[in-house]
Amino acid sequence: MGAAYIGLQLLEREKNIFLENPNIQPDLEGKDYIVERQLKPEARRDIVELLAEIGIKPNAMIDVSDGLASEIIHICEASNKGCKLYEDKIPLDSMTYETAREFGIDPTVCALNGGEDYELLFTVPQSDYDKIKEMKMSTTWSI
């Protein structure tokens, strides 16, 4: 989460540097993941397919296009429920985390308020909790 947002910050910084001095080329070395997340976002159809394969039917699902906080609010309002969000459980890849720190931005703020990640936020029945735990253990995805 937050990778597209921090990718945008990086691209904007490099654009400003280039506009001030056209002889300096953008420095995007080692930042492929976050740049790609900004320039080529992809919907996570693979997650939907995986959930179907293991027999999980989410009660609610939304893509994270406006930031995690906004999407959590949408699900809570639509279901007339609340939630607890644990900061240490928010999936942040290391490049997003490190680049946010380089920019002096709290990485959690990137995940909560950045957008265009197109990851999926979903809820499942409590009875499917063990299946989700097993799925998490068998994949490198953040669930």
Walk through the language-model features, giving the residues of each:
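Glycine-/charge-enriched secondary-structure boundary and capping motifs
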Residues: E53, P58-I143
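Short, acidic (Asp/Glu-rich) active-site segment that either coordinates a divalent metal cofactor
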Residues: M1-E49
